[in-house]
Amino acid sequence: MKQQSEVKSLKEGKFVIIDDEPCQIVSVQHSKPGKHGAAKARVDAIGLFDGSKRSIVQPVDAKIYVPIVERKNAQVISIAGNMAQLMDTADYSTFELEIPEDLQGKINQGEEVQYMAAMGKLKFSIRQ
């Protein structure tokens, strides 16, 4: 899910959609180019799910889409290789997620972990 917001309201650490990918904002720079030009903002961000850097330059009064990012808890049901089967603790739905390399060996069966959900995609939460 997503909602509209103005570019001037974006802040570091918040989220924005660039190239149909939810991204976390790393920096926002505002500039006024000239006497008759409108102020512009450069937004640099990193993709939540693919980790690639993206940037956009837009007028500050332009509308842009912001993803609704939810952090939820889930219990690890089973682990097979680098895949973990999880059950959401709120609605008891089950799903599989790939375990990132930095978390492999640290996640055990029966533990409760955090994950992020945005625009139909899921990922283990950055804050473990």
Curated annotation (Swiss-Prot):
Protein name as annotated: Translation initiation factor 5A
Keywords: Cytoplasm, Hypusine, Initiation factor, Protein biosynthesis
Any one of the GO BP annotations: positive regulation of translational termination
Annotated source species: Methanocella arvoryzae (strain DSM 22066 / NBRC 105507 / MRE50)
Pfam families (alphabetical): eIF-5a, IF5A-like_N
PANTHER family: TRANSLATION INITIATION FACTOR 5A FAMILY MEMBER
HAMAP family cross-referenced by the UniProt entry: eIF_5A (MF_00085)
Function: Functions by promoting the formation of the first peptide bond.
Principal place of residence: cytoplasm
Location in the cell: Cytoplasm
